[in-house]
Every structure is written in structure tokens, then in C-alpha cells.
Amino acid sequence: VFSEVAPGTYALTPVSNLLRSDVPGSLRAMAVMVTTPSHWLPWGRLEETLRKGISVAEDVFGKPLWDYFKDNHEEAAWFNGAMTSFSGLTASVVAEAYDFQGVQKIVDIGGGHGFFLSTLLRKAAGAEGMLYDLPQVIQTMPRLDDDVAKRITADSGDFFRAVPEGGDLYTLKHIIHDWADDQCRQILTNIRNAMVEGGRVLIVDAVLPPQSSPDAGFLMDMNMLAMTPGGCERTEK
């Protein structure tokens, strides 16, 4: 992690440099988040989760994880910061790979603080963006200071009840993997009912290979097992 450049003198390496908060691609928030009680407490009872076949996270916190974050603002801030960091690993790849021609309105469901949506809007010239998340997330959203901020509006609510109407592209980055199949169907049904005719849904999640192999998606799958009531990474099938 660190390099000894002289006896008793140490310097950052490319790895430890990512733990700074002021560098491109910083993973500081991610590193801190996984050491907070919101993560290490459920992971500490992973064996119990495996034996029961369902996450014990709600037993640990006495409430759903999202309600826990609502009551623990510091940990929620680290989580939201980590999700922004995570977006930095995927947003530019998605923006380059996807054809945004003709897209008029992107609605980012569970979009956190807007980094992913902002990145897509830089590629989708002329499109408007709607950021949709829980009230406590939208309320703590930092000011977006780049040129796409004026094209973004924000709204809050519960995506199990409804989502903003009128989008022709709805994005779900690392949302579907948080929930069991029935809950995912409800989210997607609400999107279908809200989108314009001919609208599309873009889901960004890990896709597991059909057979066990050294794939980072399996670690994420374990994290979903530990942290969520029914969430998982899925295969293409």
C-alpha cells in the first residue's frame, strides 16, 4: 500500500493514492463505507444468513437498511459517497457503449447524488434528466456544478409505489440487484406504466457467468446476500 522511499520515509503508491479524497477515481468513501457498522455487522453474521437462506441484516439493525441510513446520517453520507465512487467505475463505460440518439428524457431511478445521470447527459446532448431517489437522499444531494446541472431536475418518492412519468429512457444502476424477483417486477411495472410509448429501460448490474468462475460479480452477489432481503446478482438467463 505504501512505498518506503528512504529509511523511515514513506510515500503513496498508485493503490494508496486512491484513498485520497481529492484524486480522480477516489475510492476513499468506498473504503470507509465497508468498515462502518452498516456493512461489517451484517457480514459478521454471514454464516447465520447462509444457514437461514435469508439476510439477517434487518435483525441486526431492527429495521430495513434504508431506514437505518435515514437514522444514521454519517453512515448514509459514506454510503452515498461510495455509490458515487462506484458510478465513477461504470458511468463512462455505459455512456460510451449506449446509443442515446433520439433520447429526450432520462429518468434515473435510485440515482443517488446524480453522478451517473450527469455522465449520461454529457453524451446525450439535448436530453433532459430526472433524478429520482428517497427523500433523505435528494435532500442531501450536493450542488451539481457542471454544464449539465441545468438539465437535471430532482424528485423523491418510493419506486415501489410510482416513478416519474414521461421518460423515454429509464435507468437503474445497481438497483435491481438490491431486491428479490417480486419486488423487481413491481419496480419494472411502475416504470412501464410511467414511460412514453416506445420507451426503454437500461439496467446496469453485474451479470454472472453461467458457471462458477473467478468473477467479481460473485463477491457482489455475496454482498447482496449479506445486506439485503432477497437481493442478488443474476445471470443473463
Regions found by a protein language model. Give the residues of each.
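Conserved Class I S-adenosyl-L-methionine-dependent methyltransferase catalytic core
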Residues: V1-K105
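Alpha-helical subdomain
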Residues: E4, F100-K237
